[in-house]
Amino acid sequence: MLIANDALELFLLIQDNSVEDSLRKALTAFSKADLKLYQKKKTEALQDFKQILIDYKDDPIADETLLKIGKIQQDLKQYNEAISSFNEIIEKHAEGVFVDEALYFSAEIYRRFLDNPEKAKALYEKVIFNHQDSIYFTESQRQYRLLRGDTNI
């Protein structure tokens, strides 16, 4: 199942980012950075993804690049930087498909690592009210209720 999901994700990445980038320069750079990430070279991958944002800032791949950057920063325990990357998705790509993930991952950082349950609750709430179709909807509800103090979960 995981392989099928990976293949579908790759197909959508190529399809979504081939229209405006007919030479696929941004997509090629993204795939090279993603390969470094797969090879566990997180610091190198992070630098490459950041360079993509500089070189292809107006490219449709920018939101997915920001998501990768945020996840790497979280893995490297750069929590404030990760939140900043996720916020950029929320603010600059508000109509994109990664907003729910950015909200959820930010909430998780606030809850698990920065000990700020109020900010986490506010972000979980945004997922609950604005992204009912998100795969993070149910978990956001659960975490929100736990932070609110519900005992009948």
Where are these regions (language model features)?
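Acidic, polar-rich low-complexity tracts and alpha-helical solenoid repeat scaffolds
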Residues: 1-153
